[in-house]
Curated annotation (Swiss-Prot):
The protein, known as: Transcriptional regulator MraZ
Superkingdom per UniProt: Bacteria
PANTHER family named in the record: TRANSCRIPTIONAL REGULATOR MRAZ
SpoVT-AbrB domain boundaries: 6-48, 77-120
Species assigned in the record: Mycoplasmopsis pulmonis (strain UAB CTIP)
Principal location class: cytoplasm
Gene that encodes the chain: mraZ
Quaternary assembly: Forms oligomers.
Organism phylogeny: Bacteria, Bacillati, Mycoplasmatota, Mycoplasmoidales, Metamycoplasmataceae
């Protein structure tokens, strides 16, 4: 799966969002929305969701952090179904957790799509410059991540 690029969209009055054609094919008509890190909605197709959910089955149940994270992951995940036009309803609790009001940005992240409130996305983009990108890349390389 190769999800990439970013697309700006707006919710309609019924809190429906239309997926870009590029993402519709990869995500299918049923997919999962999760809000955990950075207040960003992660959208996964069924296969990727099952892969992610499987990781929790292998966690140490004696580790409180692992239990808490698993609870949050499953509590903050919802399955949605897109209509024939590729629109789906964003549930109220997802909108609230992600601070989404109307305008959003969908960002392809390889195996998933991130859904940002436009205001939060713009703020993130404004905080990034070439020097920060180099620093991030250097720190990742130091921790063993290869590019």
């Amino acid at each position: 799966m190769a999800l990439y690029g970013n697309f700006e969209r707006s919710l309609d009055p019924k809190n429906r969002l239309s997926l870009p054609a590029k993402f519709k094919t990869e995500l299918g008509s049923n997919f999962y929305l999760s809000v955990l890190l950075d207040g960003v909605v992660e959208i996964r197709n069924s296969e990727e969701f099952e892969n992610e959910a499987h990781k929790f089955k292998t966690m140490n149940v004696l580790d409180k952090n692992a239990r808490d994270f698993a609870r949050l992951f499953f509590q903050r995940t919802v399955e949605v179904e897109a209509d024939k036009q590729g629109r789906f309803v964003l549930p109220k609790h997802i909108l609230e957790k992600a601070s989404i009001q109307k305008d959003v940005v969908l960002v392809g992240m390889g195996d998933k799509v991130e859904l940002w409130s436009k205001a939060k996305y713009d703020s993130f983009q404004d905080s990034i410059d070439d020097e920060k990108i180099e620093n991030i890349a250097f720190k990742l390389k130091e921790s063993g991540v290869e590019f």
